[in-house]
């Protein structure tokens, strides 16, 4: 069982996230009914994450903060639509929390997720529930609660996944 996320693990997580978004574009598009049922959330999130994955594939990192910073920058540059911008904001907050950190355990990573949510909510003029913001908030809160209860990194991430499902 992994007790911390290092740069290589973070990179692999992001590449897996890119693949998962690509594989589920239509499902996410079909969920997109608010605030405008334009059916492009999955497409925009996937295209945005593609830009981060492309950057990650070109580089190796010694610490999680460098990998997170790379992801945040690439997402911002490649953001498509509102959901892509929100995704980039989430990772801007995550990256800021991980600054100066080589590896992240359950508490550090859960805190980074929480900071990502805070950054996204603060940047959106009128945050609407029932969106990517809500899913992110629920996932981060579950990770923080689990980490605060002494859960392992793996357990905290599993709690986040279940809460966001």
What spans do the regions from the language model cover?
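N-terminal loops that bind phosphate or other acidic moieties
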Residues: 1-165
């Amino acid at each position: 069982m992994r007790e911390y996320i290092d740069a290589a693990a973070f990179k692999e997580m992001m590449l897996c996230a890119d693949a998962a978004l690509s594989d589920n574009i239509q499902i996410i598009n079909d969920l997109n009914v608010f605030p405008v049922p334009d059916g492009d959330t999955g497409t925009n999130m996937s295209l945005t994450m593609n830009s981060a994955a492309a950057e990650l594939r070109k580089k190796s990192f010694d610490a999680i903060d460098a990998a997170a910073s790379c992801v945040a920058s690439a997402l911002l540059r490649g953001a498509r639509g509102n959901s892509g911008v929100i995704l980039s904001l989430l990772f801007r907050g995550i990256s800021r929390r991980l600054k100066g950190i080589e590896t992240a355990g359950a508490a550090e990573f859960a805190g980074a997720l929480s900071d990502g949510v805070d950054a996204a909510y603060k940047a959106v003029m009128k945050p609407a529930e029932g969106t990517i913001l809500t899913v992110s908030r629920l996932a981060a809160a579950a990770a923080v609660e689990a980490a605060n209860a002494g859960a392992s990194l793996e357990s905290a991430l599993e709690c986040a996944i279940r809460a966001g499902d």
